Amino acid sequence: MKLTLNRILFSGLALSILLTLTGCVGRDAHGNPKGMIWEFLGKPMSYFIDYFANNAGLGYGLAIIIVTIIVRTLILPLGLYQSWKASYQSEKMAFLKPVFEPINKRIKQANSQEEKMAAQTELMAAQRAHGINPLGGIGCLPLLIQMPFFSAMYFAAQYTKGVSTSTFMGIDLGSRSLVLTAIIAALYFFQSWLSMMAVSEEQREQMKTMMYTMPIMMIFMSFSLPAGVGLYWLVGGFFSIIQQLITTYLLKPRLHKQIKEEYAKNPPKAYQSTSSRKDVTPSQNMEQANLPKKIKSNRNAGKQRKR
């Protein structure tokens, strides 16, 4: 449940960043794009689309595909680094499950909100002690670096002159395409399925809804926009599959082996909570407070006996 919640939160974060960046590309009074992202990234991409389409004679459809491939190839290392960090944290969590299991049981069996919060605080402390990032190791910096490129390419495919009046393999790039939308949905569904194959059965059950979230979102976005933009999402789908294949079959096995060797040399130890040291009952406090009085009364009784 926690992993699913983290994915939902970061999906919302990614969508929010995308909406923010798209707001940077507006239109002037003549309908032309403007904004910082467009000037520094979108306009050069639009130039290369026009170059491949007209100077190289490849047409706008193939030009969009080529420029998208170039852009996605350049930022692929950032995506792989992000996947590596998330996979590293996931593998560590799997190895440390026996360490965290007693605390998780206390969270589930808590009889009050105070007990639950105390156990959750202890779980976070135990995770920090073992080098676990509660957010799954998904850093915001790689995402922030990638989003301007995604946004710029998105608008370059939409606003480049000549795209809306061109065709590609019988598809009108200026209109919506049901065929292209179906292909895009299939690609992102396959990518979601691949990501589920890389996790345990327990996590797979929790991620079932996420398997359909991305394809449904892509259907909505692709069918509500011209096919020229759909080509951008199409190429992006292939790159998402490539990134997931590299993560599942190259990165995760290596990380699994690496972490297994690390914990074989230094086995993880059970987390020792310090809260129990502060657990002093009221009766003990009263006894300690009354101890000087008892000693004093005993001394007085001894003096009276001597007299």
Curated annotation (Swiss-Prot):
- What Gene Ontology cellular-component terms does the record carry? plasma membrane
- A biological process (GO) annotation for this entry? protein transport
Point out the signal peptide segment. Answer: 1-23
Q: Where is the lipid attached (S-diacylglycerol cysteine)?
A: 24
> Where does this protein reside within or beyond the cell?
Cell membrane
Give a GO molecular function annotation for the protein: membrane insertase activity
Q: How does it sit in the membrane?
A: Multi-pass membrane protein
- Biased-composition ranges, Basic residues, are 293-307
Chain segments annotated as transmembrane: 58-78, 135-155, 179-199, 209-225, 231-251
Domain of life of the organism encoding this protein: Bacteria
Biased composition of type Polar residues is found at 271-288
Lipidation feature positions (N-palmitoyl cysteine): 24
* UniProt KW keywords: Cell membrane, Chaperone, Lipoprotein, Membrane, Palmitate, Protein transport, Signal, Transmembrane, Transmembrane helix, Transport
PANTHER family according to UniProt:
CYTOCHROME C OXIDASE ASSEMBLY PROTEIN COX18, MITOCHONDRIAL (PTHR12428:SF65), OXA1 (PTHR12428)
Family annotation (NCBIfam families): PRK02463.1, yidC_oxa1_cterm
This chain's function reads: Required for the insertion and/or proper folding and/or complex formation of integral membrane proteins into the membrane. Involved in integration of membrane proteins that insert both dependently and independently of the Sec translocase complex, as well as at least some lipoproteins.
Q: Which family is this protein grouped under?
A: Belongs to the OXA1/ALB3/YidC family. Type 2 subfamily.
**Name of the protein in its database record:** Membrane protein insertase YidC 2
